Amino acid sequence: MSKKLYIKTYGCQMNVYDSVKMQDLLYPYGYEPTENIEEADVIILNTCHIREKAAEKTYSELGRIKKLQDARKKQGLNSAIIVVAGCVAQAEGEEIFTRTPYVDIVVGPQSYYNLPELISKVVRHEKHLIDLDFVEEAKFDQLPEQLYPQGASSFISVQEGCDKFCTFCVVPYTRGAEFSRNVEQVYREALKVVSSGAKEIMLLGQNVNAYHGKTSDDKVFTLADLIRHLVKIPNLERLRYTTSHPIDMTDDLISLHGLEPKLMPFLHLPVQSGSNKTLKAMNRKHDRDYYFDIIDRLRKARADIVLSSDFIVGFPGETDEDFADTLDLVRKVKYGQCYSFKYSPRPGTPGATRTDQVPEHIKSERLTILQKELAAQQLAFNESCIGSTMKVLFDRDGKFDDQIIGKTPYMQSVYIKNPNKDLLGKIIEVKITKAALNSLSGEIYR
């Protein structure tokens, strides 16, 4: 009789990738995935620590799981094994057992390949097991090949960790130093997902454009080299990468956007602030003019490229003038979509120790203003697509029986009616007929 595995994933695409790998790791040990937490024998929360709210979601969910465990106990059923994985695990470690003593395992993002052994120890009645080692090479050497197809679009982790040490960010402390997978590993995984039906691959990394992976003969590949290598794979039709740091946007990578048709004309390039003073305080290692120059060069290389970004409002010391500079940058760049957040002090980071914290109500006011501007830009871009014909990769069912959803080269969701679902996994030309803030609607172009 098979055992059931439930995984809940928080945060970035890297965590989504890691969750898939956890699933693949445990399948040979008899654990089959389920979406029903009540029938799970093992429950894994793969967590995010980038903001306080994200971290507290973990403890809220653990509280709900505790109630589920108590109910099972009353019914005479076995308790599930509870695992906290990911960046909250790495950052808080033993504190998780203190706050939630019913958790069995705490495992970091670089050591989850040990989950089969850790779970087997819990089955043998060991408790409060923790593994937070930083050994990236061991992680990627130990991870299995893909067992479950990811669908028409697949994630592949090629780079992990960060050496930039932005003063607001916990990633260097939770994911470790920058590390690049070797080229052959990445290529084999790409071949596997394409043979399983993927038409698109998203290359993942905390600073993916800092990729410097080695070949079997010790030649070092940049991200541009890796992309040129991967696009040769038959039946791979689209390639993307995220997340990028402006200072690692090389001339070669920028020019590749204009030369390689399989590289999609959409780039997520976080800037965080439009104020030079704030950028310096954040230790971003560039100023606004440098960022503008990167954008100009990208648009010269490929005129139809669309940008997205991340913004933090209310970083310590941010003044009204600094915030005005951020709005000015947003209006000059004109983004297709963006993510924006209030600054959240993270324990252990330099930003958290500053005495010039911005009051919460000012952060909220600034975020409202910024998000209004970003939403207007996103809607304007979506509306500009009405009447055009776009190639859409259909990758999932819609809410209604006769509906399927795909994405454009610019990562916009597109809804169409297709009762037979025969277009899933295919790239089809669609005429865009309607636009909303977060999606497009269309019909098959005949």
Curated annotation (Swiss-Prot):
Cell compartments where the protein resides: Cytoplasm
Residues annotated to bind [4Fe-4S] cluster 2: C162, C166, C169
Required cofactor(s): [4Fe-4S] cluster
EC number: 2.8.4.3
Cofactor note: Binds 2 [4Fe-4S] clusters. One cluster is coordinated with 3 cysteines and an exchangeable S-adenosyl-L-methionine.
Residues reported to bind [4Fe-4S] cluster 1: C12, C48, C87
Occurrences of domain MTTase N-terminal (ranges): 3-124
A GO CC term attached to the entry: cytosol
UniProt KW keywords: 4Fe-4S, Cytoplasm, Iron, Iron-sulfur, Metal-binding, S-adenosyl-L-methionine, Transferase, tRNA processing
CDD domains attached to this UniProt entry: Radical_SAM (cd01335)
Role this protein plays: Catalyzes the methylthiolation of N6-(dimethylallyl)adenosine (i(6)A), leading to the formation of 2-methylthio-N6-(dimethylallyl)adenosine (ms(2)i(6)A) at position 37 in tRNAs that read codons beginning with uridine.
Subunit structure: Monomer.
Family: Belongs to the methylthiotransferase family. MiaB subfamily.
Protein name in UniProt: tRNA-2-methylthio-N(6)-dimethylallyladenosine synthase
Organism, scientific name: Rickettsia bellii (strain OSU 85-389)
